Amino acid sequence: MIVIDTDCLSLLDRERYIESSKLRIHLEKFEPDEVFATIISFEEQMRGWLSYIVKCKTVDDQVFGYGRLHAFLESYRNTQVLDYDQAAANIFRKLKAEKIRVGTMDLKIAAIVLANNAILITRNLSDFKQVPQLSVEDWTV
């Protein structure tokens, strides 16, 4: 099972970047039912687009923002999303108690990945490698 971190999900929306191409090449090796996002990534991306829209100063910027929000929602229609369930919450509490210096949202993503015995695909190796027993890979290098 592969879980794509928020940073890589965002990168997949930017097809013109070489990192996006590298990520897609790796993803093609897996069946669609082996690739997941997390509800935490959904929340992070949703908050990002809503924040963008709130800050828009022009109608044209709003049109762009709502268009991107719509595209984001459409992309998740075909995405399997792992929940932040009780097993993940228990792991999250344990990791918090260990005082691992990783942001709360990243720690929740790590907990979901650990609860599902998955591999996390991210560019943020410096943070996620601090999480004990978490399998992480960067497919953009």
Name what the model sees in each region:
Residues 47-53, 75-121:
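Active-site neighborhoods of divalent-metal-dependent phosphate/nucleic-acid chemistry enzymes
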Residues 25-29, 73, 81, 110, ...:
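Short secondary-structure boundary/capping segments
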Residues 39-40, 85, 124, 140:
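Residues at the C-termini of beta-strands that transition into short coil/loop
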Residues 13-16, 49, 96, 132, ...:
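Short, flexible helix/strand-to-coil boundary loops that buttress conserved ligand/catalytic motifs
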Residues 8, 41, 88, 109, ...:
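Alpha-helix capping/helix-boundary segments
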Residues 1, 110, 114-141:
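Acidic, PIN/NYN-like endoribonuclease modules and their adjacent C-terminal/linker elements
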Residues 1-40, 51-70:
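Short, well-structured N-terminal submotif of metal-dependent ribonuclease cores
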